[in-house]
Amino acid sequence: MKKLIIALVAMFSMTFTTASAMSYEQARQQALFLTDKMAYELNLTDDQYEAAYEINLDYLMGVDTYDDLYGVYWRQRNLDLSYILLDWQYRNFCAASYFYRPLYWDAGYFHFGIYARYPRRDYFF
């Protein structure tokens, strides 16, 4: 009986702390929207845009759980972006929380902070 209760508690705690990974199509759309806004605000070149898109896509594809939000993939993403952005671009990137921390967790789901700044999800520059 004790083992059953422990197993049930473990199962419920895992259910509330995990989320399903994004599909490739959803990650691609989110990375494209995020990178488009980065290009607009940070004045990215074409080469920077392509590299930032790939970096953002890799990060979004790597996020599966709450722990992944600001884990290894997030640190690698920001490190990679520091290599492709100029100093002033990277400072502005870090100052904008919707770029620096593109995902946040609320009520058991991932949310994209960029939509607080740009609510029209179908508008690209």
Name what the model sees in each region:
Residues 25, 29-36, 40, 46-125:
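Low-complexity segments
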Residues 1-26:
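Bacterial Sec-dependent N-terminal signal peptides
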